[in-house]
Design a protein with these regions (language model features):
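A basic/glycine-biased coupling hinge at the interface between accessory DNA-binding modules
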Residues: 15-16, 37-189, 193-194, 201, ...
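N-terminal pre-P-loop "Q-motif" helix
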Residues: 1-15, 217
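Conserved helicase motor core of SF1/SF2 NTP-dependent helicases
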Residues: 26, 208, 212-284, 295-300, ...
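Accessory C-terminal helicase-associated subdomains
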Residues: 393-398, 431-539, 543, 560, ...
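Conserved helicase core region in the C-terminal RecA-like lobe
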Residues: 79-87, 207-210, 235, 345, ...
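Helicase C-terminal subdomain and adjacent C-terminal extension
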Residues: 601-618
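ATPase/helicase motor core of nucleic-acid motors
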Residues: 259, 303-305, 334-457
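Helicase P-loop NTPase motor core
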Residues: 20, 24-32, 261-264, 269-362, ...
Length: 618
């Protein structure tokens, strides 16, 4: 690759601190690799004295492979590693720390799962809850969340409990997680002169990729290691700082020149990835942020890009538009792998994934795709549908389904009355004949199931919510468990939209079986390279696709707020709004040729306002 002037300046840099502000698609990896090669081949630096830090194992592996493609014989001795790997090496060398002391990710999940079971915590989606729990534990340790702020976190009534139980679990087994690794490493370097002397003597040239993603503690460790030579070559983009929940903060990058005297500043401001229109619009957006280096990115791509705001009626029409567009564009020569569908949250992708499966479009998910049919509300509604279907067929029902919803809403039916795996509801009436009010409730349930069995799937959900009064149960459940009723209710409405495509309960059950099987395959099989990528904004960072769909570009979602409002625009504090704008900027700049921003007019029949960020693109 031929280097431009700014890239050359960065690559030729030898000593002293340098901050490279690298915009999207500006060739930052090439610059890091070429500069590493130059240090050895041109300036004679000992490879053993070079440390290249990345944020993921995949990035470290890629960086090393890119370097070795330039020079096999000059590659030996360079340390390519993640920050966590670096911390582990230091602790292993200067303390009794071993790999056995580090908790595995699977064990972290198991730990939180056991806490849920131990305290019988009432939660909706267990996988999402565990991920969020581990995030706020990390947030406390990295300083992104203060302990006193726990009350403001979703599932706040469990936050302190989970944190304390998790820490007790680690302590009892003499284990550390990755955040502990960082803290222990910092303390070691401060207290053990031999360790810091060794590291400074070995790592005389430090190159840091994705510098905008580091937290304060990681920054302190880098400064400790770099002193007094301060040969730090930091590469990042303040406009792509999107991990505040991990403690990342653009101010770290903005203060680099203050912390490292005589810093040279270079801006890589040519985007070789995206076409001109996409670059122009993303520039317009990000310039509304104030906490940033002032820069304007230009395009170095010959791609004739298209960027388009697509207004749709609702989520169903949004899904239909995306499916039809993918089918049409693949006929014109694009592969499935040329497409990405990006969402602000993982939950938003559930109904879209069901449509991809229904249309036999291969896809891969950057996250562990959650199954929309395994949520608390979905399981209740499916139990009602199963009861109605079985009762309509032979007047009997399965015990497991009846137990799940027999008191949703409250009917005072007791579990001990249901001993057989298959329940005859006529027999159940006889068992409660002496309890008039319960007898009436059972008769009412039988009548409801009988009528429910005659309905199509979508109207059946309306009947469950309003006539059977499951809606009232959700109101009480949300109140008792400090959850959002609106979010629970919307899960039911989302099921209704999915079921609207089916004429019978049999079709629904068959589709759910197929959906669950294919979802399980997606979790374990990433061998199919020709597949549409479904991802959140965060997980798409660093990737690129010829065609990108950004869904649900509506207020309250982009920018995102847990506290949705139906009256006017949601208000954000400046810091949160700027991070959300950076996140939208990152998602837009994943696109090479075509960018589609879809805007539903309604979500579950509720009127929605287009994202305020769309106004900033005009």
């Amino acid at each position: 690759m031929k280097l431009n002037e700014n890239q050359k300046t960065a690559v030729e840099h030898l000593e002293g601190p340098m901050l490279v502000i690298a915009g999207p698609g500006s060739g930052k990896t090439t610059v890091i690799v070429q500069r590493t090669y130059n240090l050895i081949s041109k300036y004679g630096v000992n490879p053993d004295n070079i440390l290249v830090i990345t944020f993921t194992k995949a990035a470290a592996k890629n960086m090393k492979e890119r370097y070795l493609s330039l020079s096999d014989d000059l590659g030996s001795g360079i340390t390519f590693c993640t920050l966590h790997s670096l911390f582990f090496r230091i602790l292993r060398t200067f303390s009794n720390f071993t790999a056995d002391n580090l908790i595995a990710e699977t064990l972290q999940f198991e730990c939180i799962d056991n806490i849920i079971k131990k305290f019988k915590l009432e939660i909706d989606n267990k996988n999402d809850f565990i991920k969020q729990a581990l995030l706020f534990i990390s947030g406390i340790k990295t300083g992104a969340i203060k302990k006193e702020e726990l009350k403001n976190i979703e599932y706040s009534k469990y936050s302190t409990l989970i944190y304390e139980e998790y820490q007790a679990y680690l302590k009892s087994r003499r284990l550390l997680d990755f955040d502990d690794l960082m803290l222990y490493c910092y303390r070691l370097l401060l207290s053990n002169e031999e360790s810091v002397f060794y590291c400074r003597n070995k790592f005389k040239y430090i190159l840091v990729d994705e510098f905008q993603d580091i937290c304060e503690m990681q920054y302190k460790i880098i400064r400790l290691l770099a002193h007094p030579l301060n040969n730090v070559f930091a590469v990042g983009d303040d406009d792509q700082s999107i991990y505040s929940f991990r403690g990342a903060n653009p101010s770290i990058m903005l203060n680099f020149e203050r912390d490292f005297k005589n810093t040279r500043l270079i801006t890589l401001d040519t985007n070789y990835r995206s076409g001109g229109l996409i670059v122009k619009l993303s520039n317009k957006l990000i310039k509304h942020n104030k906490e940033r280096y002032n820069k304007s990115i230009s395009t170095g791509s010959d791609s004739k890009s298209c960027a388009k705001i697509v207004n749709v009626n609702n989520q169903n029409s949004q899904n239909r538009y995306i499916i039809d567009k993918i089918k049409d564009m693949t006929k014109k020569g694009y592969d499935y792998s040329d497409f990405a569908i990006l969402a602000r949250t993982n939950k938003e992708t559930e109904s879209l994934i069901s449509e991809l499966i229904r249309n036999n479009i291969a896809f891969s998910s950057r996250e562990r795709a959650s199954n929309i049919f395994t949520g608390l509300v979905a399981l209740d509604i499916l139990a009602y549908l199963n009861l109605a279907y079985k009762y309509g067929a032979n007047k009997t029902v399965e015990r497991s389904h009846l137990i799940r919803v027999m008191n949703k809403p409250l009917r005072y039916i007791k579990r001990e009355w249901l001993k057989e795996p298959i329940i005859d509801l006529a027999d159940l009436k006889e068992r409660v004949v002496l309890k008039d009010w319960v007898f009436y409730n059972v008769v009412s349930l039988i009548d409801n199931l009988k009528f429910l069995s005659s309905l199509k799937p979508a109207p059946a959900i309306d009947y469950i919510l309003n006539t059977i009064n499951y809606r009232e149960h959700l109101i009480r459940y949300a109140k008792d468990n400090n959850l959002s009723f609106d979010e629970l209710y919307e899960q039911a409405l989302e099921l209704k939209e999915i079921f609207d495509k089916f004429a019978t309960f049999e079709e629904v059950f068959s589709f759910i079986d197929d959906y669950t099987k294919k979802l399980a395959e997606i979790k374990t099989d990433f061998s199919n390279k020709n597949s549409v990528t479904v991802s959140t904004f965060h997980s798409a960072k660093g990737l690129e696709f010829k065609n990108v769909f950004i869904i649900n570009c509506i207020d309250g979602n982009i920018p995102y707020s847990k506290n949705k409002s139906n009256k006017g625009r949601i208000k954000f504090d400046k810091k949160s709004l700027e991070e959300e704008r950076r996140l939208f900027y990152v998602s837009m700049t994943r696109a090479i040729d075509n960018l589609f921003l879809t805007v539903p007019r309604f979500i579950h029949s509720k009127d929605k306002i287009p994202s305020g960020f769309l106004d900033e693109l005009r």
